[in-house]
């Protein structure tokens, strides 16, 4: 079998971190004996510059046919038209592929807790996953309007939309430490009242999982004061967007956090959670670990290569533990150095 992968380098540092990761994929495929083909497409701001829109039909159709999609990063101050922004291409891609699940792991690597802005004893051993609903909620709700005197956004969820994301979270928790924290604002929001009701109903199907409910403001506090208490966190779109960014700084850098977005069938999208960092684009100083860890998720989930994913992750964790990092993590290596060291380790 030959896996079909669509590569979307995007903007800013996206091309350099994605292209380097693809060089690692070539080494890994030879080592673990599997076949793939890459289809490159412009996306985001780069696509606006070339085609006048952030996501063309050609790119969208290629993504629909793919086994996996690897995305570098999109956006930047260059693209200011509110009706034609790079981010709108990503929203359209998520909606078109029905990517209703977003998975964001946060892991504090052994020996690297000193990198965190929080006290070492508070974060050491943190290993949590945020499961965010990605295609409903206030980002997609109708009606919405804006004028100089009034603006309206609508936060809507159906039972079916809540059930499908909650089932994903319960299954993930059952495969890990068996703890699920459901986050809502049930004390004031009607949508959260339905959310909590559905979570409690679905929990009856997963007796092996312990469920805890937290209001979103309390959860944001506990993520800082005691992140080690969490295993799997599930939440709606807006809450997940905010909490996952908060959690991502716990290990010490946005550059350490991968993510995956998927539906019940079809291709999965893998990307680091950081932005395009146009201020350092082309300077060979970008931290590529988030992109490489996203590749590891792709190897495990879409390419059926769990051993390869494990090896890649262990090499990364070892490098971080021994200070072989870029400047944002206190190291002295550049982007190329990271890829060269990983290439040597994989070829060993």
From Swiss-Prot:
SUPFAM superfamilies: Isocitrate/Isopropylmalate dehydrogenase-like. The keyword Cytoplasm applies. It is found in: Cytoplasm. Coiled coil: none annotated. GO terms for molecular function: 3-isopropylmalate dehydrogenase activity; magnesium ion binding; NAD binding. The keyword Oxidoreductase applies. Substrate binds at residues 94, 104, 132, 217. The record marks 139, 185 as: Important for catalysis. Belongs to the isocitrate and isopropylmalate dehydrogenases family. LeuB type 1 subfamily. This is 3-isopropylmalate dehydrogenase. It comes from Staphylococcus aureus (strain USA300). The lineage of its organism: Bacteria, Bacillati, Bacillota, Bacilli, Bacillales.
């Amino acid at each position: 079998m030959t896996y079909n992968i669509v590569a979307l380098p995007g903007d800013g540092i996206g091309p350099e971190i994605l292209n380097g990761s693809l060089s690692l994929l070539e080494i890994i495929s030879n080592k673990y004996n599997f076949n793939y083909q890459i289809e490159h497409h412009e996306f985001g701001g780069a696509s606006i510059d070339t085609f006048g829109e952030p996501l063309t039909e050609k790119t969208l159709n290629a993504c629909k046919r793919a086994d996996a999609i690897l995305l570098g990063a999109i956006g930047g101050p260059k693209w200011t038209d509110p009706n034609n922004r790079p981010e709108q291409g990503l929203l359209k891609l998520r909606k078109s592929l029905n990517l209703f699940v977003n998975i964001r792991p946060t892991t504090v690597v052994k020996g690297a807790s000193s990198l965190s802005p929080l006290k070492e004893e508070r974060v050491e051993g943190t290993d949590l996953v945020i499961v965010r609903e990605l295609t409903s909620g206030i980002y997609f709700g109708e009606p919405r309007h804006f004028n100089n005197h009034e603006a309206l956004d609508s936060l809507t969820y159906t039972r079916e939309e809540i059930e499908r994301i909650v089932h994903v979270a319960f299954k993930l928790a059952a495969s890990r430490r068996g703890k699920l924290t459901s986050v809502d604002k049930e004390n004031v929001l009607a949508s959260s009242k339905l959310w909590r009701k559905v979570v409690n109903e679905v929990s009856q199907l997963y007796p092996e999982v312990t469920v805890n409910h937290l209001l979103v403001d309390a959860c944001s506090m506990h993520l800082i004061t005691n992140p080690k208490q969490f295993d799997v966190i599930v939440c709606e779109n807006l809450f997940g967007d905010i909490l996952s960014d908060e959690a991502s700084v716990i290990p010490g850098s946005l550059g350490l956090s991968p993510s995956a977005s998927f539906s019940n069938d079809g291709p999965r999208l893998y990307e680091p959670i950081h932005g395009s960092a146009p201020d350092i684009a082309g300077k060979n100083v970008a931290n590529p670990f988030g992109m490489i860890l996203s590749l590891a998720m792709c190897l495990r989930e879409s390419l059926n290569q769990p051993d390869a994913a494990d090896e890649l992750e262990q090499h990364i964790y070892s490098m971080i533990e021994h200070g072989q990092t870029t400047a944002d993590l206190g190291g002295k290596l550049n982007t190329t150095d990271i890829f060269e060291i990983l290439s040597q380790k994989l070829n060993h």
